Amino acid sequence: MNKKILETLEFDKVKALFEPHLLTEQGLEQLRQLAPTAKADKIKQAFAEMKEMQALFVEQPHFTILSTKEIAGVCKRLEMGADLNIEEFLLLKRVLLASRELQNFYANLENVSLEELALWFEKLHDFPQLQGNLQAFNDAGFIENFASEELARIRRKIHDSESQVRDVLQDLLKQKAQMLTEGIVASRNGRQVLPVKNTYRNKIAGVVHDISASGNTVYIEPREVVKLSEEIASLRADERYEMLRILQEISERVRPHAAEIANDAWIIGHLDLIRAKVRFIQERQAVVPQLSENQEIQLLHVCHPLVKNAVANDVYFGQDLTAIVITGPNTGGKTIMLKTLGLTQVMAQSGLPILADKGSRVGIFEEIFADIGDEQSIEQSLSTFSSHMTNIVDILGKVNQHSLLLLDELGAGTDPQEGAALAMAILEDLRLRQIKTMATTHYPELKAYGIETAFVQNASMEFDTATLRPTYRFMQGVPGRSNAFEIAKRLGLSEVIVGDASQQIDQDNDVNRIIEQLEEQTLESRKRLDNIREVEQENLKMNRALKKLYNELNREKETELNKAREQAAEIVDMALSESDQILKNLHSKSQLKPHEIIEAKAKLKKLAPEKVDLSKNKVLQKAKKKRAPKVGDDIVVLSYGQRGTLTSQLKDGRWEAQVGLIKMTLEEKEFDLVQAQQEKPVKKKQVNVVKRTSGRGPQARLDLRGKRYEEAMNELDTFIDQALLNNMAQVDIIHGIGTGVIREGVTKYLQRNKHVKSFGYAPQNAGGSGATIVTFKG
C-alpha cells in the first residue's frame, strides 16, 4: 500500500499507541515494520492470533514475556566468524531463558485450545547444552569460576596469594601500628599498601605507590609483599588469557545455532506483539473485526483512535453501494469521519484491532487513496484548487475496483457552480468504474445527485438546532443542511439581515422539509438502537463478571498455597523469636563459652518447623508435581553452589548437567531447581552461608548494602555464628562505601570478636573499601 496514505492518516502515531504494552525490542521492531496487506490469509492469521491470545488471557490473565534486547546483530557477528564478548553472551542468555520460560508456560497451559499460537510456541528451540554453557556468565557480567577448571585453578592461586599478602600486611599493621596514620590496609594502583605517616616513610622498606593530598600519608607496598604482588599480577594476566579462551570456546559452541537463536528471538517478539495487541484491546475496549471477502464494510460505534473523547458512529458500506457523499457545513466533523473510515481499514489490514463494537466488519483493498486537506477555510485560492485537482488526476489514473477512495471537499476552491459540476462528474466516473468512494462536500447540488443516482447514498453530520452546535454524529442516508441562517443568528448577525437573506432564496422548502423529516426519523432510529446497545452492554457486563469470577477461582488456588506458606513462616518466626530470648539469657551467663552459645543457637533453630502439614492441600500437590526436574531446567549444584542446566537423564535415574564448560553427572538429591526469574523479584531478609567443600566452593559472602544499621548488625552476628559452625576459614562481608556507618560497625564488631584472626578491605577489583575479608582463627 502506498506510503502517502499512511502519512495522511498518521498511521505511525496509531502504532505508537501499542508501544507501551511491548516487553521486547524484537516486538517493538516488528511493530514499527508493520504495514497493511491485501493478502486475506495473512489478515485472517493475525485476527486468529489475537482471538487465541484473548482466550489465553482468560485462563492466564497475568501472562507475560521476559524482556529481551535485539540480538540480530549479535547473531550476524557469530555467523561471520567473530567471537562474542560477555555483554553479547548475556543478551543470548536472556533470549534462551525467555524461550525456555515460554516453552514451560505452553507445556503447562490447560483449558485453552490454540492453533495459530501453538505453531509459534512449538517452533521455539530447546538448547539445554547452550543454556548450561551460558551459565558461566552471571548477570553482573562476570565469568564464574566453574566456567573452566583452569580458571578455577588460577583464581584459587590468586586467592591464596592474596591471603598471604593480607596475612603479611595484618602482621605489619600490628608491628608498625605507631607508624601508620590508620590501622587498615589500603589499595593503590591495584596493589595492597599501608598508610604510613610521612615522618616514618624511611622506616618501612618497600615501594611508594601514592602520597595523600596533604602529604601527611605515604602509601607504601612493603618489600615483604612485593614479590607476592608480582605473582598476583602474573596470575591476573593468566586469568585474562583464560577468560578470553573461554569466550572463544563458547562462541564456537554457540555459532552453529546462531540462526536458530535469531529465529527464536523473532518468535518471542512476535508473541510479544500479539500480546500487546490484546492488552490494547483490554485497555481501549477495541475488537477484532470480521473480515469481508467482498469489500463490504460495517463499522459499529467506530472511533478515531487519535481523537480524544471521539464520538462513536456507525458506517455501513454495503456491496451494492459505490459512493457515500457527506454534505453539510464544514464544522461538523466530515473530515474526521473520512479519516476514521480510512484509518480503521488500514489498522485492520495491518492485523491490528479496531476501535469499534463487536460485529464490525472490514473489507480488503489493494490500495487506499485520499485527497484530504486540513485547510477548511472558505478563502481557498486557485492554487489550492490546482493542487487538489493535480492530486485527484493522479489518483484517478491509479484506482481500480480493488481500491478505496477518500475525497475531502471535492470540487472546492473554485467557482461553486463549476466546482459542483466537476464533483458530480468525478463521482459519476468513479461510480461507473465501481470504485468505492467516500467524499465530503458543502455543495447542495450533490444532494440531488445522491438521491437520484443508483449505488450512491447521501450522508451528513448531525447538527443540534436547539444549541446550534454540531454533535459530530454521522447520519447515513440523510443529506446535510448548511444551517447558515441559524449559525449566522447565533454568531450575532442582525435578524433583519438574516430575514432579508432568507427571502432571496427559493421559498419552496419541500426538499429541506424532507431532509428534516429524515433527520427526525434517523434520530428516533438511533434512540431505539441505543436502547438495544444498552441491553447488549448489560449482557457483556454479565459475561465479564462470569469471566472475572472464573479468574478469581483460579487465583484462589494460588492464594491457598501462599497462605499455607505464610502460616509456616509465622510458626518459624515465632520459634526463632523464642530462641532469641533464650540466647539472651545464655549470653548473660558468664560460665558459658562462645562456641557453646553458637551450638545452642543452632540447636534452637532446628526447633523451628520446616513445614506445615499440607498433605491435603491439592494446590500444593499440583505445584509439587510441577517441580519435577526435566531437561532444560536451570539448577544449583548443592556441593558447589554453582548454577547449571540439565541436559539429559540417564537410565539409572541420574542426571547429566552442563555447568559452564564442565559436564557433571548428578543424583536428584545433589541439586535444587532454580525458580523462573521474575522481572522484579521480591527481596527476602535472609543470610546466606555457603559451606566449603574441599576448598573448591565459592567464598561465603554477606551483603549488607541497603540495610539499616541495627538490621545489618543482627545479620552480621548470625552470619559469623554460622560461619564458625561450618568451620569456615574465611568469609567476605560487603558493606559498600556510602556514609561509612555500617563499615565502621562491621570493623568494631570484628575487633571485639575473639574468633577473628585478621580482617581488611578487599582488593580493588573485588570491591575495595566497599568489602571486608575476614579470616578466622584455626
Swiss-Prot record:
Pfam families given in the database record: MSSS (PF20297), MutS_V (PF00488), Smr (PF01713)
Superkingdom of origin organism: Bacteria
GO molecular function: ATP binding; ATP hydrolysis activity; ATP-dependent DNA damage sensor activity; endonuclease activity; mismatched DNA binding; ribosomal large subunit binding; rRNA binding
Smr domain segment(s): 702-777
Any single GO BP term: mismatch repair
UniProt entry keywords in alphabetical sequence: ATP-binding, DNA-binding, Endonuclease, Hydrolase, Nuclease, Nucleotide-binding, RNA-binding, rRNA-binding
UniProt-listed Enzyme Commission number(s): 3.1.-.-, 3.6.4.-
Binding sites annotated in the UniProt record for ATP: G328, P329, N330, T331, G332, G333, K334, T335
Enzyme kind, highest EC tier: hydrolase
PROSITE patterns: DNA_MISMATCH_REPAIR_2 (PS00486), SMR (PS50828)
SUPFAM superfamilies with a match to the protein in the record: DNA repair protein MutS, domain III, P-loop containing nucleoside triphosphate hydrolases, SMR domain-like
Gene3D superfamilies, A to Z: 3.30.1370.110, P-loop containing nucleotide triphosphate hydrolases
Matching InterPro entries: DNA_mismatch_repair_MutS_C (IPR000432), DNA_mismatch_repair_MutS_core (IPR007696), DNA_mismatch_repair_MutS_sf (IPR036187), MSSS (IPR046893), MutS (IPR045076), MutS2 (IPR005747), P-loop_NTPase (IPR027417), Smr_dom (IPR002625)
Family, as annotated: Belongs to the DNA mismatch repair MutS family. MutS2 subfamily.
UniProt cross-references to HAMAP family, sorted A to Z: MutS2
Function per UniProt: Endonuclease that is involved in the suppression of homologous recombination and thus may have a key role in the control of bacterial genetic diversity. Acts as a ribosome collision sensor, splitting the ribosome into its 2 subunits. Detects stalled/collided 70S ribosomes which it binds and splits by an ATP-hydrolysis driven conformational change. Acts upstream of the ribosome quality control system (RQC), a ribosome-associated complex that mediates the extraction of incompletely synthesized nascent chains from stalled ribosomes and their subsequent degradation. Probably generates substrates for RQC.
Subunit structure: Homodimer. Binds to stalled ribosomes, contacting rRNA.
Entries under PANTHER family matching the protein: OS10G0509000 PROTEIN-RELATED (PTHR48466), SMR DOMAIN-CONTAINING PROTEIN (PTHR48466:SF1)
Protein name as catalogued: Endonuclease MutS2
Organism field: Streptococcus pneumoniae (strain P1031)
Gene that encodes the chain: mutS2
